[in-house]
Amino acid sequence: MSTVTTPSAPKVGFVSLGCPKALVDSERILTQLRMEGYEVVATYEDADVVVVNTCGFIDTAKAESLEVIGEAIKENGKVIVTGCMGVDASVIRNVHPSVLSVTGPQQYEQVVNAVHDVVPPRKDHNPLIDLVPPQGVKLTPRHYAYLKISEGCNHSCSFCIIPSMRGKLVSRPVGDVLDEAKRLVKSGVKELLVISQDTSAYGVDVKYRTGFWDGQPVKTRMTELCQALGSMGVWVRLHYVYPYPHVDELIPLMAAGKILPYLDIPFQHASPKILKLMKRPAFEDKTLARIKNWREQCPDLIIRSTFIVGFPGETEEDFQYLLDWLTEAQLDRVGCFQYSPVEGAPANLLDAAIVPDDVKQDRWDRFMAHQQAISAARLQMKIGKEIEVLIDEVDDRGAVGRCFFDAPEIDGNVFIGLDDGSTVQPGDKIMCRVTDADEYDLWAEML
């Protein structure tokens, strides 16, 4: 008697680099491959082909991408490259000529077709037996997910090359966004992190046209989108918010508990001169007034931001202006980067003095020390307060979670001691009382 053997599923390795927006691209590619019967494996040696989703935002990210591509070639040999760095394929092929395919961001079908060329899907594959969840393959923990609402950006910040890599703003249909959010919530997601290159510009490209969701008209606009997301009973957190005037409309939704009182606004600098060189909004005095007004309307509001020090033309006076502005603004969560020139960025052509590396480092150190003192003082005010915590991890030492003012990966944590026999699991929301704080994290006891 002859034995019939069933061919094994083709295996794909996947490395996703860069920002949450790239992570969502990776999830979309992996979902399509899983629907076609591919198995996703965790090691190079087990894979029939490896896909590397690259980051090309700054030169250090490009260097990391090239290093990972080289590692994949060495360990596996069959490598497909996609993502932001793939916009200029020659940069990759000059270093790694053996890569099988190079595509740019959002070119999902081309990536999948490239995988087909290397290792075709099984002809007898039945997509009905794969059990790919309705929300697709997710690379985040089960209890939170990134919700990408648009691609591209209409701004021309002089330090950035995102528009050249991802194009102009293209908003997703509001009904599609809300359908995806609903599927994620149904699958157990407790927190939706709304992302794009410019979240607050959502709908500008389609003139805020009216779409439909659940049979009701909904404008393709940030405020209306947040109102709808706020009806789903989960945390809704906004990232990459450009400080347009209509952002003011979101504050009442936060005060009413519809969405989290958390704004991630990359101010980048405060000096009017540097903001002008960056081609960013240069109304720092009005920004301070807006922050004050926002906090009057929503006292719990948490503001996160990022800044660049050492930008061409930045003087000690400009830097001190930034420190003074931080003192006035009293931001809660802040990141800082030393300026790094990016190939193709307009800032490279500025007629402005280059800041020496040692001065950049000194200013970064001073910036971080200055902001740490502000952050520590603001977190000290949380001691004794009751907070709701979303649990991310549980081990024999206790639980690690986040409250409404902590985004995953980039902000602080809440550390909670647990009694023996505790049933707390990742994804649970529990009430706690804050007992201690430092400049980044909180410690709390379960109520």
From Swiss-Prot:
Its cofactor is [4Fe-4S] cluster. It catalyses: L-aspartate(89)-[ribosomal protein uS12]-hydrogen + (sulfur carrier)-SH + AH2 + 2 S-adenosyl-L-methionine = 3-methylsulfanyl-L-aspartate(89)-[ribosomal protein uS12]-hydrogen + (sulfur carrier)-H + 5'-deoxyadenosine + L-methionine + A + S-adenosyl-L-homocysteine + 2 H(+). HAMAP family: MTTase_RimO. Binds 2 [4Fe-4S] clusters. One cluster is coordinated with 3 cysteines and an exchangeable S-adenosyl-L-methionine. GO terms for molecular function: 4 iron, 4 sulfur cluster binding; aspartic acid methylthiotransferase activity; metal ion binding; protein methylthiotransferase activity. Residues 10-120 form the MTTase N-terminal domain. Residues 380-447 form the TRAM domain. Its main location: cytoplasm. The lineage of its organism: Bacteria, Pseudomonadati, Pseudomonadota, Gammaproteobacteria, Pseudomonadales. Its EC number is 2.8.4.4. [4Fe-4S] cluster 2 binds at residues 153, 157, 160. Belongs to the methylthiotransferase family. RimO subfamily. This is Ribosomal protein uS12 methylthiotransferase RimO. GO terms for biological process: tRNA modification. [4Fe-4S] cluster 1 binds at residues 19, 55, 84. It is found in: Cytoplasm. Residues 139-377 form the Radical SAM core domain. One of its GO terms (cellular component) is cytosol. Catalyzes the methylthiolation of an aspartic acid residue of ribosomal protein uS12. Keywords: 4Fe-4S, Cytoplasm, Iron, Iron-sulfur, Metal-binding, S-adenosyl-L-methionine, Transferase. It holds the Pfam family UPF0004. It comes from Pseudomonas syringae pv. syringae (strain B728a). The gene is rimO.
